[in-house]
UniProtKB/Swiss-Prot annotation:
Glycosylation sites: 20, 61, 76, 88, 126, 139
Alphabetical UniProt keywords: Early protein, Glycoprotein
Superkingdom of origin: Viruses
Keyword flag Glycoprotein: yes
Identification of the protein by name: Early E3 22.2 kDa glycoprotein
Source taxonomy: Viruses, Varidnaviria, Bamfordvirae, Preplasmiviricota, Tectiliviricetes
Length: 195
């Protein structure tokens, strides 16, 4: 049982960090959502829906729009998907990957007195532990503890590096508990044989 848990943690860590790196953005369904990307005015940014390889369909039907803050989705839009921001400026070209995941249940505003932290790229959120299906790039999925945002309109952005560190911390804690369990078992065994 312990071996299976260790194997799960290790596999999940490798599983989600291979391939193209992408930020995982959680948003409450039926609320506004933002794929946060702030660049200079001289920088050109083109948003692409990875499923079609074209600009997102929501831009033409009015359910999303682009601003200097990034790609905004309206409350009428609630579709998961991988979006790519192509960044072009002088002597610099890059692509940011965002996997948008909508949460339909148990996604509500947390109490105001909950501890607050600063997330990736300045996103503010509350910690709320639980299990959720995390989707990585290229439809990779697995379960791991998650965090929920304190305000429905602000998404949580977790990089895959952060997820790897998160899983590594869990792995370390479980390893220490297992080591203590082994020590206690050996101690009881020696006492039983009078050593």
């Amino acid at each position: 049982m312990r071996f299976c848990f260790f194997f799960f943690c290790f596999t999940a860590s490798i599983f989600c960090t291979t391939g193209n790196s992408s930020d995982i953005v959680f948003c409450c369904a039926h609320t506004p959502c933002l794929l946060h990307l702030e660049v200079d005015q001289e920088t050109s940014v083109t948003w692409i829906d990875s499923n079609t390889g074209q600009i997102p369909l929501c831009l033409s039907n009015g359910t999303c729009h682009i601003s200097e803050k990034g790609l905004h989705f309206s409350a009428n839009f609630s579709k998961d998907g991988l979006y790519i921001a192509i960044i072009n400026e002088t002597n610099y070209h890059a692509a940011e990957h965002y996997y948008l995941v909508y949460i339909y249940e148990n996604c509500h505003q947390m109490p105001y007195d909950s501890p607050r932290h600063t997330g990736h790229k300045g996103t503010s959120f509350n910690w709320s532990m639980g299990l959720w299906l995390v989707k990585c790039s290229h439809n990779k999925t697995f379960f791991l503890p998650f965090v929920l945002d304190s305000a429905k309109s602000a998404p949580i952005i977790m990089t895959e590096t952060a997820i790897t560190i998160y899983i590594s911390m869990i792995f370390l804690i479980v390893s220490l508990l297992t080591f203590l369990n082994v020590l206690i078992t050996l101690n009881n065994k020696y006492k039983h044989y009078g050593v």
